[in-house]
Amino acid sequence: MNALDLPKAPHETRVVVAMSGGVDSSVVAGLLKRQGFDVVGVTLQLYDHGAASHRKGACCAGQDIHDARAAAEHLGIPHYVLDYEDRFRDEVIEKFAESYLAGETPIPCVECNRTVKFRDLLGLARDLDADALATGHYVASRALPGGGRALHRALDPARDQSYFLYATTAEQLDFLRFPLGEMEKTETRALAKELGLSLAEKPDSQDICFVPQGRYSDVIARLRPDAARPGEIVDLDGHVLGRHDGIVHYTVGQRKGLGLSGPEPLYVVRLEPDAARVVVGPRTALATTRIRLSDLNWLGEGPAEAVRDLPVAVRVRSTRPPRPATLTVGPDGAVEVVLAEPEDGVSPGQACAIYADDGPRARVLGGGTIRRVDALSARPREAA
């Protein structure tokens, strides 16, 4: 086996590297090239860059395409730029807008990985007769004794991206490789300098690529100019406290920007899109221990349908560590997560990544989209 767990000599092994123009994917390309693999770089143009082309901290911006091309030229590997704007708009941006209008808090990076990157780009890699598709994600992939591969949290906990990759299927994992999963970021930057890459000190991307300055409502207004409608801001008992200009301006757990005053801080507890209503309450009303999921991607042992009260750990936000929970998949396919301790600010539309345990290198068992959150103390929803 070579360094990528493939039964071929490196020079006979073609690897397509998804090059975003950042330091991580460029180092992956350089590292594999140095190890003797037949490396082909591919960069995806995903959206109309416009003003974001030169905006610092943006992912996949126009400058990144230039940087990816320059890195490939420096490394002496072929490089292709593919226009995936239509696919990205249909599979990611439009779904993002619909989810927000439904009162959810979507995670577009999960959908992008699920579709454009690990479905469409992986298919392209196969068309190029590649043996593997490698990316610069900080997540680990390990061979399983009985065949196939397992996904694990990265060595560098501060960089671990497993939360965004839970939807990767077992079939995709067989073809994917993540060389940075066993490295820390400082080591990656040191390798970039060693490889002579000019972007060794390039800042990491911070924003979602199509959301300038994190202003989601601006994106929704552009995509659905007539969708936002004003409505009431009410407390848990239905008393009107104020008005708003559209639920797209709010997300569960939000405190700032409500324009309300009172004896205690108020937070967005839930959004009711059919009534254009924002429900607010005290922080205690955000707590939940019971979450329902849809679109389960199962990477664990055995069929998902056999899972009953399985001890696991889950992450309901990328910034939070895995927390102990139990997982049950009902006979009808309903997926329920019961948390050992309450979590605050869990919103429909968010991702829930499932792990075998809460350890630093835990195996990823899959995950799903949060569809329902049962609050501990919130009043029952009024009938629509």
UniProtKB/Swiss-Prot annotation:
Belongs to the MnmA/TRMU family. The record marks 137, 350 as: Interaction with tRNA. One of its GO terms (cellular component) is cytoplasm. Pfam families: tRNA_Me_trans, tRNA_Me_trans_C, tRNA_Me_trans_M. It comes from Methylobacterium radiotolerans (strain ATCC 27329 / DSM 1819 / JCM 2831 / NBRC 15690 / NCIMB 10815 / 0-1). ATP binds at residues 18-25, 44, 136. Residues 159-161 are annotated as: Interaction with tRNA. One of its GO terms (biological process) is tRNA wobble position uridine thiolation. Catalyzes the 2-thiolation of uridine at the wobble position (U34) of tRNA, leading to the formation of s(2)U34. InterPro entries: MnmA-like, MnmA-like_C, MnmA-like_central, MnmA-like_central_sf, Rossmann-like_a/b/a_fold. Keywords: ATP-binding, Cytoplasm, Disulfide bond, Nucleotide-binding, RNA-binding, Transferase, tRNA processing, tRNA-binding. Its main location: cytoplasm. Signal peptide: none annotated. This is tRNA-specific 2-thiouridylase MnmA. It is found in: Cytoplasm. Gene3D superfamilies: Adenine nucleotide alpha hydrolases-like domains, HUPs, Translation factors.
